[in-house]
């Protein structure tokens, strides 16, 4: 998916895919990020996420996301949404990304890939990381649920189901 976005010169998609894959963000959460959020994340290493149901959380960001934010900030004015042009509508920008995935899905190794599937992959990796760090299964799930912003073990179990 990243290769396809790169070939299509969709730098914004590369950053959005990285946010889902390496920070566990939902599609809507990615499109809520504005330039101020990105600037603060670059300074602190943590992104403030406005999540589902008005819940907020901080998630750590990796180097790939930081590099992506720097690139995106060059093309945006202060206060503007990071992934939505000033003359565009958020729901249309989100729909274009979803169509990009659908259109290019047959080229991916895993053809059933979805945007939300990137979030599932992140959940699995974080869970395994916490287990390796010595957390109990319950505590590892609790930490994953905090990263995801829902704080519910039953929802986390769904993300971790094979």
Locations of the language-model features?
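A short, glycine-centered helix-capping/turn motif at helix boundaries
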Residues: 19-32, 129-130, 150
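Short, well-structured alpha-helical segments
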Residues: 14-21, 115, 153-157
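Conserved tyrosine-mediated DNA breakage-rejoining catalytic core shared by Y-recombinases
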Residues: 32-68
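Basic, Lys/Arg- and aromatic-enriched nucleic-acid-binding interface segment
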Residues: 1-27
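Catalytic-site neighborhood detector that most strongly recognizes the C-terminal catalytic loop/helix
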Residues: 53, 146-162
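Short basic/aromatic active-site micro-motif
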Residues: 110-130, 137, 141, 146, ...
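Active-site/catalytic core of tyrosine-dependent DNA strand-transfer enzymes
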Residues: 62-124
